[in-house]
Amino acid sequence: MALQFTEREFIPVLLGGDINAYSVARAFYEEYQVKSLVFGKYQTGPAYRSQIIDYTPNVDIDTMPVMLKTVNGIAQAHADKTIVLVGCGDNYVALVAQAKDAHELADNIVAPYAPYSMLEQCQKKEIFYELCEKHGVPYPHTFTFTKAMLNAQGEAPAEVLDQIDFPYPMILKPSDGIMWWQHEFEGQKKAYEIADRAELEQVIRDSYASGYTDDLIL
């Protein structure tokens, strides 16, 4: 059965090519029967070749000049439409929010984001938890591992890991998700379910050896 599309007063423009972009495009289609314009870095991934998506790869789409040229060009070409601009990933959200703050987006672009300074606070996990503490919002018990805790060999000292007072398995994730993906390494994940002490030591070692410098949240 062929998909049916409806002309609307808006066009979804999504940045990213992974499952997040596909999921947002699918939500737009299911609710409004519209096709989303999606821009990702590579000609692969869940968003590529989807029937509900018009996908364009551009390896530099995550840079400010290319992103602005792309989305403002779409806005100009569809001046009678509202362009709903959505970043499908922390780096794209940050990019769009900064452009919005600087008033660099065309007038018919809607970017549904708070000021970048506020987003930055929420994206950094340890700051987010501090805000939860301040406002009485429950959150999981955490331990923050910093790069300064490493020993001279670039490893997590036993006396530091002994301070972690909750059992395995435990979840480990980077505080700065944007920086995290800028330093790729073998076995890298968005979040880890750490089974034991040996795995914890390995993930910490690999994370900082890659060039990542921000905190790890356990």
Protein language model regions, located:
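Short catalytic-loop micro-motif centered on adjacent basic/acidic residues
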Residues: 13-14, 84-86, 140-143, 217-218
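Short, acidic/glycine-rich phosphate-metal binding loop used to engage nucleotide
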Residues: 117-119
